[in-house]
Amino acid sequence: MSNYAVYSDDGGITWHTSKTPACTNGDEAKVVELSNGNVLMSIRNRAKGYRLFSKSTDGGDTWSEPKLNTTLLDPACNGDIIAYTHGGKNYLLHSLPASPTTRENVTVYISSDNGETWQAKRRIFNGYSAYSSLQVLEDGTIGIIVEEGKWDGGLPGEDGFNLGYYRFSLKWLLEGDPVEPVAESAE
């Protein structure tokens, strides 16, 4: 299975496929345009352990060899990555389960250098959890939807999932504000 980028430069009138794959051992990739115009692809690593990243310097036409980022754990699970600008500073936010082997403890990581390093992280959900999706809200806070496993003593996840919705601020993420993210029921 390979990760190619399919993209449009004219609002969806025409579409292009990258000439080279970003990765041949991953799937469920997410892309984000960096503050310098390059494109970063975050790739689910089917081998588990750590997240894979590939970069394009030509708008998604060709991709670098994928590299493991040993800061971002990846239990072979989908995650999300978004660009976020606040106070004149550019950030990347990435949500993933914080385990190399088990889908649990969905956490948000933050980078201020276009994904080269990931300095801060805060856990959103404690326990069995998997896919997540991030969104910058109109008021500048960040919303996240998380698959939260229900567990009644069997194998994690076999009892199904609830969707949890949380909202948090950049301050909470960066400074460790003791206020937990605001949960809004999405059940």
What residues fall within each predicted segment?
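Asp-box/BNR beta-propeller blade signature and adjacent active/binding-site loops
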Residues: 1-187
